[in-house]
């Protein structure tokens, strides 16, 4: 299955793929998920609908992969030797402008996720689950190094804390998350909860 999927996706250069993803994100910002069509993406990118469907299979998958390409670094790959260092690399690898754009997109997709099980599954499979797995890997290394107690009850809730911050800040303070806020949140909430 993975070979068929990679063969299906190998016909477009990485540069063209990035161009298509950016066009999808631009259209999402302009019209929202519900009004986004493969016809509009094809017109914007001067490609055929057949190419889009061959490459991505569905609108939900295309949207999820476009969002995934905005992630600056895979959390699984971060390993500085300390949890503080790992979180600092995670924050430094983030871009304030991109986080502001992503916050607006996520806010716009919140309703669509509840209305579209296919979008919900695509976002979980391609965006949320890989990030949570990477974060859990990072946290497990901290446990293995003795930085966090293996029975720390907060370990299971770190993804919830971080995702919650991205949702709550725009709602409460009407501003997107930025690196300064993330550092402050991690130092004031995440590390104390982990006993670090």
Q: What are the language-model segments listed below?
A:
Residues 1-44, 50, 61:
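Basic, helix-initiating cap at the start of DNA-binding domains
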Residues 1-7, 89, 96, 133, ...:
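C-terminal peripheral helix-coil segments that are non-catalytic and often amphipathic
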Residues 20, 35, 58-63, 73-74, ...:
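Short amphipathic alpha-helical segment with a characteristic S/N-K-E followed by hydrophobic residues
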Residues 75-104:
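Hydrophobic alpha-helical connector segments
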Residues 92-99, 106-115, 186-190:
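Helix-loop "lid/cap" segments that line or gate small-molecule binding pockets
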Residues 96-108, 118-145:
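Amphipathic alpha-helical packing segments from all-alpha helical-bundle domains
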Residues 121, 125, 129, 143-188:
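Hydrophobic/aromatic-rich alpha-helical bundle segments in the mid-to-C-terminal region
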